[in-house]
């Protein structure tokens, strides 16, 4: 971490030591661990060991994010995975938005992952594609805080680096191509109304992964950041049920 970009309050990584079953929790693009902390705390209360890494360039300043690549974001998640592997025999991975993309990447690369839980996971965002043609523009408007529940704000950047959008577009394409490699059990949450990631991403993921055990659950009362929205309790309860079924 550079001193020039201190970590924002609430955006710190979180770690909870518990049982030999671990849960890796990933936040999304331009967001922070704040969006996943309620889930991490709930899983820790159930006795699980939980790790919520802060993705490189996130939870600081958008100019810091501009310097990071999707390989950096993968490295952040893999560090968390290693932390859990030192403490756990069984690991589940869950992620929101690009955190879901990272979750899919991990399941493609590490077949030992016991199960995954995706929340509005991203593999193609057509609205972002024109950014590939942009030259000379560094920052776009914010994409964070797409939440239906009143009075709730996501701790996310007020601007989106163009360079970072190009990174996520490349990353999503790579992950989509390898989706058939995902064979572990998968629980897929999708908001009916999402202003960031088109809900049909979840249907595509469901269709392309090779998992025998897979299910989609609709979230009717939440927008994109469902982990901070009206369906937060549903996500937590259904995830815990899913994990207990798989173990």
Language-model segments: which ranges?
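Short beta-strand/loop motif that positions the catalytic acidic residue
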Residues: 182, 188-190, 194
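Catalytic histidine neighborhood in serine/cysteine hydrolases
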Residues: 203, 207-225
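Active-site nucleophile loop of the alpha/beta-hydrolase fold
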Residues: 117-127
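Catalytic nucleophile-loop/oxyanion-hole region of alpha/beta-hydrolase
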Residues: 61-87
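Catalytic active-site module of serine/aspartate enzymes centered on a nucleophile-bearing elbow/loop
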Residues: 221-247
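Conserved alpha/beta-hydrolase
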Residues: 43-64
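Gly/Ala-rich beta-loop-alpha elbow adjacent to hydrolase catalytic centers
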Residues: 95-99, 103
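Conserved alpha/beta-hydrolase "acid-adjacent" motif
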Residues: 195-201
């Amino acid at each position: 971490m550079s001193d020039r970009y201190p970590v924002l309050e609430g955006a710190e990584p979180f770690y909870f030591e518990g049982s030999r079953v671990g849960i890796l929790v990933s936040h999304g693009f331009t967001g922070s661990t704040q969006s996943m902390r309620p889930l991490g705390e709930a899983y820790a209360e159930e006795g699980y060991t939980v790790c919520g890494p802060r993705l490189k360039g996130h939870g600081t300043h958008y100019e810091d994010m501009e310097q990071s690549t999707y390989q950096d974001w993968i490295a952040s998640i893999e560090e968390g995975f290693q932390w859990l592997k030192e403490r756990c025999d069984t690991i589940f991975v869950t992620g929101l938005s690009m955190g879901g993309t990272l979750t899919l990447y991990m399941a493609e690369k590490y077949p030992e992952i016991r199960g995954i839980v995706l929340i509005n996971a991203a593999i193609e965002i057509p609205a972002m594609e024109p950014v590939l043609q942009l030259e000379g523009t560094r920052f776009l408007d914010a994409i964070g805080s797409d939440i239906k529940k009143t009075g709730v704000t996501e701790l996310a950047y007020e601007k989106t680096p163009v360079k970072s959008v190009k990174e996520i577009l490349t990353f999503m394409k790579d992950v989509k191509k390898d989706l058939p490699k995902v064979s572990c059990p998968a629980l897929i949450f999708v908001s009916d109304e999402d202003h960031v990631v088109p809900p049909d991403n979840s249907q595509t993921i469901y269709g392309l992964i090779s998992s025998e055990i897979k299910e989609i659950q609709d979230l009717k009362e939440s927008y994109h950041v469902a982990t901070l929205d009206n369906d937060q309790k549903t996500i937590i309860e259904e995830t815990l049920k899913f994990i207990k079924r798989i173990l």
